[in-house]
Amino acid sequence: MIEKTLKDVKGIIRVSNGETAPDLIVKDAEILDVFSRNIFKGNIWVYKSWIAYVGEKEPPIGDETIVIDAKGYFVVPGYIDAHGHADLFYNPSTFADFVVTKGATTVFSDAHDMINAIGVDGFIEVLKTSDKFAVKFLWGVPAAYPPYPKIEGGELFSIHEIWKLFSRYKECVSISELSPYTRVLHGEDNILERMLMARSLSKNIEGHTLGASYDKLNALVAAGITSCHESIRESDLKNRVRLGLYTMIRHSSIRSDFEQLCPVINSLPIDSMMLVSDGVFAVDLLEKGYMDHVIKKAIDFGLDPVVAII
């Protein structure tokens, strides 16, 4: 994310007021307003990297203003993947270079596979270069990896190392998906202490609650889990929405839950629901696309197009 300076804010205001020409204008576009869920014809004025104005007014045009004639085209916000795996099948840098061409601007990715391969120090180097990626990455830090350390070996991270990542790098926004949720239900000190620390820093806790009953979901939510991407039936979706989880509906290279769940979404409030990729094979990225493909498939399975995008 590019931080604004005071000079930047003043420049945005001057462009928005029509006092100076924008650097770029997208003209005569059909614009999707995600707040009112309406589509209107208008212009978008851009100053440097920021949108300064959206509406019907015509701006002053400077000698260096880039004008894009968008007549007949729809303009929508950049796509966000709220649960991906940018570290599993490819280098995050080359992944970012490709998916930005498919409309993605932000990706939340679990980092346990990357960290398992390159270690904590390698992951920190990735974080240090994050401003050079073509999309904004947000990362989940593994708090339970390997999932069952008594069987699979020692914990990848100490609680202090997790705390350092959360404290020093704003891109680390969550504990990555907790697949061994039975350890939470059994009240293991090790994992609960990590969850408490994360919540004390206002970080999210990604759930992986496949197969959890409504009663078990209650306990997991009470323990601090904030989301889940493992709804595969109508009851799963409704239970997670009811309990206040950020509820993610998946269309990935491994499995898709759209056919069962997209018709259900239309009957529920969507404020806490989102479409996610949960990992896409490289061949599928090249042949089908990324979140643009996810949105198209959701529409194919009956989701309202505007709802699918927002």
Predicted regions and their residues:
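Glycine-enriched alpha-helix->loop->beta-strand junction motifs that scaffold or abut catalytic
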Residues: 104-105, 169-172, 219-227, 242-248, ...
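Divalent-metal coordination cores built from histidine and acidic residues
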Residues: 2-16, 94-204
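His/Asp/Glu-enriched, well-ordered alpha-helical/loop segment
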Residues: 264-310
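Histidine-rich, glycine-flanked metal-binding segment
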Residues: 2-25, 30-76
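Divalent metal-binding pocket/active-site signature
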Residues: 177-234, 251, 255
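Hydrophobic faces of well-ordered beta-strands that scaffold small-molecule active sites
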Residues: 78-86, 107-109, 137-141, 173-176, ...
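Divalent metal-coordination and catalytic microenvironments
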Residues: 29, 49, 72, 83, ...
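Di-metal (Zn2+ and/or Mg2+/Mn2+) metal-binding site signature of metallo-dependent hydrolases
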Residues: 73-96
